[in-house]
Amino acid sequence: MACKYSTLIDSSLYDREGLCPGIDLRRHVAGELEEVGAFRAQEDWRRLVGPLPKPYAGLLGPDFSFITGAVPECHPDRMEIVAYALEFGFMHDDVIDTDVNHASLDEVGHTLDQSRTGKIEDKGSDGKRQMVTQIIREMMAIDPERAMTVAKSWASGVRHSSRRKEDTNFKALEQYIPYRALDVGYMLWHGLVTFGCAITIPNEEEEEAKRLIIPALVQASLLNDLFSFEKEKNDANVQNAVLIVMNEHGCSEEEARDILKKRIRLECANYLRNVKETNARADVSDELKRYINVMQYTLSGNAAWSTNCPRYNGPTKFNELQLLRSEHGLAKYPSRWSQENRTSGLVEGDCHESKPNELKRKRNGVSVDDEMRTNGTNGAKKPAHVSQPSTDSIVLEDMVQLARTCDLPDLSDTVILQPYRYLTSLPSKGFRDQAIDSINKWLKVPPKSVKMIKDVVKMLHSASLMLDDLEDNSPLRRGKPSTHSIYGMAQTVNSATYQYITATDITAQLQNSETFHIFVEELQQLHVGQSYDLYWTHNTLCPTIAEYLKMVDMKTGGLFRMLTRMMIAESPVVDKVPNSDMNLFSCLIGRFFQIRDDYQNLASADYAKAKGFAEDLDEGKYSFTLIHCIQTLESKPELAGEMMQLRAFLMKRRHEGKLSQEAKQEVLVTMKKTESLQYTLSVLRELHSELEKEVENLEAKFGEENFTLRVMLELLKV
């Protein structure tokens, strides 16, 4: 199993008693993101739930925190929210340890059950429910399917923990272990690991996964008890293996600890045997193998963290930055981890056999292998283009010989891909990928085809954004400089066009030849729709609402319609529902998405940070809100003065290419007079209701509920 995000460290520096023999200790390169997530959770707890010690001893560690060692292959873009969720678990666990009767387990469980059904309602909820809602929402924005796994497994764990009041009288270690192995937080931990590492265990292998993981659960739970006993032994609700062994054998604490250490080493050996045997099996999926391999680092990471973490070893174990963040907050000491690093594989290696001196050589932080790219001509790997001083001979005979040589070294696609790679590196909510995954709950398109369709949609969407920003002269995209402002107009156009060509090539490789016709048809429609948007802007012509909606259907809705039609063409269950049955959903989601974008451009502070204040007015776009405003002004003679002023502003924008802040503020004042923003919001809410109804209709036609699609719609609600 390749390791992308971690490096090997010397386990003997931490696991001095050899509690995890045979398992490497790895350290995540983005441990900073874990600490940010933990401190954010602490700040939210104090704000929403109640007081918390400063500094709080949850998952933090002085050299590395818990997830950094226990999930060293967590995707960097998921690290912060995984840490937030686990820190919430630590804080909630401390409440249970203090007094299980005041832990509000039913409230947390109710919220998790809500998220499983696609409805997230936090109005009037208590602080812990609000935090759980926040966790699920953030995870849904990254990976809806695996976020649902987190919600389901966590809800099961909460229900298990609620039995603590009944299961307290354990007479023997063997009686205690089955309960404790689950209570160690396995259900939550299972969800967080599969989400963090993007693992999906097939349904038919879930029971086998539980069977294989049992030795790891026993080892982790007993090791946790070993290190936490000093902290817990005076708690009112203490349940700990050290105490149980002392009572069972009538021995001292030290003798009980020795008994547990032997059992911990035994269970570690049992789990390593399971790992080895699973890797050799041909009857299980690669995803199950990856899960079993990833879980071994829970053991080594947990052991190393437990030896010096503040939670078990006292407050002197916090490092300087942790103390500063605890005292002054994240606002003063924010993350030092760049967004570019969050989305890139940083280290290449092998999780089984790599040694510290065997890690791949790095050049400016990039693996040497990453500097090799397929050139797009014959599939051969050639070095990426790097400008170097010319060594060509200027002797005439040599130049003639060079001119006669056809087999010259290829130029790679690195240069043409740079603008595209820059755009796709910017923060994105991944809505279209989420839509494809959600719709595929019904259509059952094979994974290979799903990936190809996702790639096509990503390329087309990204290329259209590059060209849109250029055509609109937008300075920002997602809070960063737009592509053309960095690479120039010519390179941006060339890179975007290359994506259209590459997407065409991928589409031609899909199983059903009909997908190619769908692709061409919808791509033509998309460009025709864009032509009207540009035409109205250039000529300062206000379309009717019907014309605007038709333009949206062709442009924004076209991409949604394309992906649904292509998925239906590739679906093995297409006979259940004809193509036309998905048309209304595609139409509604396209219109909702565009009108929502129009509204947020004028009303959202977050949108202003990402794209600039009221940027649509700078671009001269006739948004839904502006069209309503103009039509309302034209229908009311008493507002003739405001209409003349608005026309003057629009003409000024055409000549100067933008509007001043003061002019945009005046336009917004006029929109308030016509109640255009409120009207837009009302239309959005009605459209959202229609979308929910259409999902119900589709659920009835397919005979299958679609919770992930419902949650996705819930997250889009304005």
Swiss-Prot record:
Enzyme Commission identifier(s): 4.2.3.145, 2.5.1.29, 2.5.1.81
Residue numbers binding dimethylallyl diphosphate: R477, K555, T556, Q594, N601, K611, K621
UniProt short sequence motif NSE/DTE, positions renumbered to this chain: 224-232
Short sequence motif DDXXD 1: positions: 93-97
Binding-site positions, Mg(2+) 2: D93, D97
Sample GO molecular function, one term: geranylgeranyl diphosphate synthase activity
Region ((7Z)-ophiobola-7,19-dien-3-ol synthase): 1-320
Binding of Mg(2+) 3, residues: D468, D472
Positions annotated to bind Mg(2+) 4: D468, D472
Family that this chain belongs to: In the N-terminal section; belongs to the terpene synthase family.
Protein name according to UniProt: Ophiobolin F synthase oblA
Provenance organism: Aspergillus clavatus (strain ATCC 1007 / CBS 513.65 / DSM 816 / NCTC 3887 / NRRL 1 / QM 1276 / 107)
Encoding gene (name): oblA
